[in-house]
């Protein structure tokens, strides 16, 4: 398993769709998504998600979008594009962002017959249609992917090998959900997850030389190899010597590159990642503490418990009772 896939797996990435929106120029709204905005029945889809990433898939027309407070960082998006808001910041969308914004939550209309929430708002000008959805993450504040993404992330689904499939499937499933057809929400949930993974991969591929951060580490061959090894075999009793030998670098060269790109030494990264996997196991499985300790590479339950309490301020059993 590659490192990106492993990080997203542990984060319990989930997706869904909650709104069909239709706007007519001139218009401007301010919005941030919360669980209360998601369509009925999507609570189970969210699962243990503690963080939501809204996205907007544009079907027709174009508009501007920016994160509130980020003046001068407007994006113009049009048909076939998806814009994601990785930190779920309050963001402005509209035909003209200089207009006084209306709160998105004030213009949402409730779903009918098990379909989507809907919005119809604006003047008498050009129409813009979009589908709004979300990605749910568990423990996003500790997730190395989320922390390195920009405030706004744009994906053009017209580009890439799967463009036609993504576009046609998304539009078909959205139409099915809008009329309350059973099973279509599941299709859109999985497609939402695919869109996010594709957006992250394309963003990582387009990073400029000299960029730092976890995603930039995936572009440096030796660091990417080290990350893949650590994620693939988390239970191994890794040492810096072992890892440097596997990736074909000296200890010092690997440590320098890893720290420059990832921000901390390889063994510190591994220790942090083991704790993230531990929280996932504690929250979503019935595995014993001894079993979890073995899975993530600790020699004993006691050693695992000490490390966990140091990281989170509570013993694993206590944490499980509070977060299960």
Feature-to-residue mapping (PLM):
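An amphipathic alpha-helical interaction segment
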Residues: 131-228
């Amino acid at each position: 398993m590659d490192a990106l896939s492993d990080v997203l797996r542990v984060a319990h990435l989930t997706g869904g769709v909650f709104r069909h929106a239709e706007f007519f120029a001139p218009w401007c709204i301010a919005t941030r998504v919360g669980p209360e905005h998601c369509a009925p029945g999507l609570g189970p889809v969210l699962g243990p998600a503690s963080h939501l990433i809204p996205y907007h898939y544009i079907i027709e027309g174009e508009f501007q979008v920016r994160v509130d407070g980020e003046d001068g960082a407007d994006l113009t998006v049009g048909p076939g594009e998806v814009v994601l808001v990785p930190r779920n910041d309050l963001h402005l969308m509209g035909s003209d962002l200089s207009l006084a914004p209306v709160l998105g939550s004030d213009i949402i209309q409730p779903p009918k017959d098990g379909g989507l929430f809907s919005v119809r708002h604006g003047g008498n000008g050009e129409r813009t249609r979009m589908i709004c959805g979300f990605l749910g993450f568990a423990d996003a504040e500790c997730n190395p992917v989320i922390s390195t993404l920009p405030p706004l992330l744009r994906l053009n689904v017209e580009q890439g090998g799967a463009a036609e499939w993504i576009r046609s499937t998304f539009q078909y499933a959205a139409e099915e959900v809008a009329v309350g057809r059973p099973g279509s929400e599941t299709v859109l949930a999985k497609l939402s997850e695919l869109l996010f993974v594709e957006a992250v991969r394309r963003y990582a591929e387009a990073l400029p030389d000299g960029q730092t951060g976890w995603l930039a580490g995936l572009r440096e061959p030796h660091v990417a190899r080290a990350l893949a090894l650590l994620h693939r075999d988390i239970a191994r009793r890794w040492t810096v010597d072992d890892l440097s030998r596997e990736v074909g670098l000296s200890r010092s060269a690997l440590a320098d590159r890893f720290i420059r790109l990832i921000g901390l030494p390889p063994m510190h990264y591994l220790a942090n990642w083991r704790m993230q996997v531990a929280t996932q196991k504690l929250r979503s499985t019935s595995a014993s503490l001894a079993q979890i300790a073995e899975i993530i590479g600790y020699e004993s339950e006691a050693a695992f418990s000490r490390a966990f309490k140091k990281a989170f301020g509570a013993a694993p059993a206590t944490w499980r009772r509070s977060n299960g």
